[in-house]
Amino acid sequence: MKKFLFSLCLLSSTVLASPQSELTERLNQNAGFEAGFTQKVLSPEGDVLMQGEGDVKILRPNLFRWHTQTPDENLLVTDGNTLWYYNPFVEQVTLMGLEKATTQTPFVLLTRNKASDWDNYSVSQNGDAFTVSPKADSAVKSEFIVRIQENGKVTGFSVVEQDGQRSDFDFTKFEAKKPAKDNFTFAIPDGVDIDDQR
């Protein structure tokens, strides 16, 4: 009988947990991770517009390195204050303040967990898929679907734009470990154009 009641209590607490608190709990299981990714961009009709791949490193809070290798190389990296976007093809680096640059993207939820980050979103859950939707009065217009297992392993995410275009990112070689902090700095190469928007 005790075992049954204990199981019932566990079940009740699981049922009562909101999708937002469940997502927060899963995200909080890892202080950081590294993974490879594949990307597929689909038109509203489902046609493949682009495919790519790269790797990502996240160290919570606020540190990330997103390196797209194909089809066109670019690098997005932040030290928690400055966000660098480097495009080697056009030989340009853009510098932005992290807070300003990430205010209107739900991707920030993967990289930190401030209570105020959730103010613009509502969350629904379907198994291991959590749909993070902008509230009606939010400046954010895209929907974010993060796929994360109970143990905190992020298997990927999707971004659905207002016009129906969709970007799917699937993570491979996921490692739940803290990447070294030296991954989150950027030395500007000689000779590149600098667009400082901080």
Swiss-Prot record:
Any Pfam family hit: LolA
SUPFAM superfamilies (alphabetical): Prokaryotic lipoproteins and lipoprotein localization factors
Domain of life, source organism: Bacteria
Cell location: Periplasm
Any one of the GO CC terms: outer membrane-bounded periplasmic space
Major localization class: periplasm
GO BP annotations, alphabetical order: lipoprotein localization to outer membrane; lipoprotein transport
Signal sequence, renumbered to the chain: 1-17
Family per record: Belongs to the LolA family.
Subunit structure: Monomer.
Name listed for the protein in its UniProt record: Outer-membrane lipoprotein carrier protein
Gene assigned in the entry: lolA
